[in-house]
Curated annotation (Swiss-Prot):
This is Pantothenate synthetase. The lineage of its organism: Bacteria, Pseudomonadati, Pseudomonadota, Gammaproteobacteria, Alteromonadales. Keywords: ATP-binding, Cytoplasm, Ligase, Nucleotide-binding, Pantothenate biosynthesis. It comes from Pseudoalteromonas atlantica (strain T6c / ATCC BAA-1087). One of its GO terms (molecular function) is ATP binding. Its EC number is 6.3.2.1. It holds the Pfam family Pantoate_ligase.
Amino acid sequence: MRVISNIASLRDVRRSWQADSKVIAFVPTMGNLHQGHLNLVKEAKLKADIVVVSIFVNPLQFGPDEDLEAYPRTLENDRNVLSEMGVDVLFTPQVKDIYSRGLEQQTFVEVPGISYMICGASRPGHFRGVATIVCKLFNMVQPNMAFFGEKDFQQLQVIKAMVTDLSMNLTVHGVKTTRETDGLAMSSRNQYLNVEQRALAPTLYTRLQEMQQKIESGRRDFSRITSECCEQLAEAGFSIDYIEIRSADTLLQPGHEETNVVILAAAFLGRTRLIDNLQVSLA
């Protein structure tokens, strides 16, 4: 595996792949890799000749009171794991190379509408930061396809919309959420949880499953179903950011003809923000 931190060097390698008509898959990450990330890599390896993984903790997607400085950085271990998996290139750019004119002078990519709702309402500017860095990385790597986890469902929809709107020549694949044995969605931030919080954390997924069962049983009183879940989670010790039932296609409020919805959730245990989602068919 080659480790490349220079954009020009990456482009040189990319040209050689292009000359050989290689199919290139890309997995962008912020590092501190867990099995969820590795499953993205596995999917990429199944579909492409070349797999590129990036590790870049993107300051543009963190709010002023969020965990940019505390975010776990485990580059040496990540490098070893990716090498063992047979990744072709690990791209590790620096902030000064990605944002050469500084964060304030940076050209931004913003996907209107979908970026401002749900998680975007709780974290203003977050999806602008995500769309900007992903667009820049796509321009650098120029992959044929890219892989993202469905755990970050709204992020996945933002990226798909950006790719469509900007006529980018690549396919975006969503990969099923990877969970711990007790159901907790894997996340690099789970390590912030203390012992008591970690024991409680899977309750979020359990409550979403109960919402799913209520909908599948025929209930369509989505507001009441959501309120019931919020009450149960609050009683258990969670601080609710949002629990929403939205169209899986548009993330808008479900219409009468909706066939697929997604339950989206974000809640805090202490200072740790957990997110999860479940898709539900109404057919």
